[in-house]
């Protein structure tokens, strides 16, 4: 009887911990992406205009592909 109650308490605790961890991680990621949004083409276009460059479609595509390639290399 005591072993069964111990196992039940352990299972309930593990489930509660998993649910709390999921929602905690979800809230953290939402906050992180609000503070640090991923770079998109519109942001690159604005940065290029601020630097005095004319943002052509070719340049934007080159910059986006180089950023994606750099992200892939850094993940390895």
From Swiss-Prot:
Question: One short Pfam family name for this protein?
Answer: UPF0154
Major subcellular site:
membrane
Bilayer disposition of the protein:
Single-pass membrane protein
The cysteines joined by S-S bonds are none
Q: Where does the record place it? A: Cell membrane
Location of region: Disordered: 55-76
Task: Give the transmembrane ranges.
Answer: 3-23
- The residues forming a coiled coil are none
First and last residue of the signal peptide: none
Keywords, in A-Z order = Cell membrane, Membrane, Transmembrane, Transmembrane helix
GO CC, alphabetical:
plasma membrane
Similarity remark: Belongs to the UPF0154 family.
Q: What is this protein called?
A: UPF0154 protein LCA_1273
């Amino acid at each position: 009887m005591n072993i069964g109650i111990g196992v039940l308490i352990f299972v309930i605790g593990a489930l509660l911990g998993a649910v709390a961890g999921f929602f905690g991680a979800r809230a953290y990621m939402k906050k992180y992406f609000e503070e640090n949004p991923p770079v998109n083409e519109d942001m690159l276009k604005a940065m290029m205009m601020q630097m005095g460059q004319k943002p052509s479609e070719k340049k934007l595509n080159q910059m986006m592909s180089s950023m994606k390639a750099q992200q892939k290399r850094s993940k390895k």
